[in-house]
Amino acid sequence: SLVISDLFSAIERDSAVIEAAAAELRPLLPPEGPVLVLGVGNRRVTADALGPRTVQKVFVTMGPRTVPVQGIRPVAAVAPGVSAATGLSLQQLAGALVRELRPAALLCVDSLCSAEPERLGRTLQFSDTGLHPAQPDHSRHLDAARLGVPVLAAGIPTLMQAEEGRDLVVTPRDLDGVIAHGAALLGAAINRALQPKLSVAQLCWLVG
């Protein structure tokens, strides 16, 4: 994980922070092969919108009319939505995409839950053990055993349980800003980790 003292100063063009975050993620990735970035969460709920907002910042290089370019890694990105809107579980959607695209790895981006308030909106976290949300619903759990490919996870803590036994959550004061800046920063770090031959400035220009 990478701790950031002030997320709002570490915008998507802060190359030092982006390079540090990319350096955390890059060793977890396979050395080559296509990568599918999955934006997990509900774009209509601010605290849960980090995944969908981040995939909008990912440099996508795959497509039906895309010509492979030497040195550019094939990358696809999608935000599958929530099961209440699609009628399909996250596992079903991720499994179908993996079977169709056959990526070397699946990178899931999601809002995280923290047990420590000081970590809210201030930590970029990366894992190579899959995505295991706090909810007891196992249809949202994604890992190599279920999907047959390495599953990485990336995210920022955006909420925490208020008190044990109470159905309340705590979020950062400026949650909209945390999601907006966090998605931009995380997207830039993912791009840099996936495309090491392109500079931060080049990637920012390509994504827009």
Give, region by region, the residue ranges found by the protein language model.
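Extended, charged alpha/beta regions that create polyanion-binding interfaces
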Residues: S1-E32
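Short glycine-rich or small-residue beta-strand-to-loop segments that form or flank ligand, phosphate
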Residues: V3-S5, P34-V45, A77-G81
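Conserved active-site and cofactor/substrate-binding residues in soluble primary-metabolism enzymes
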Residues: E12, A16, A20, A49, ...
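Conserved acidic residues
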Residues: V35, A104-A105, V151
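Gly/Ser/Thr-rich loops at beta-strand to alpha-helix junctions
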Residues: G39-L50, A84, S111-A115
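Glycine-rich phosphate/diphosphate-binding loop of Rossmann-like nucleotide-binding domains
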Residues: N42-R73, A77
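A structural-propensity feature for long, helix-poor, extended segments
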Residues: G71-R102, L106
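A structural signal for small-residue-enriched, beta-sheet-centric alpha/beta enzyme cores
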Residues: V78-A79, Q92, C108-G208
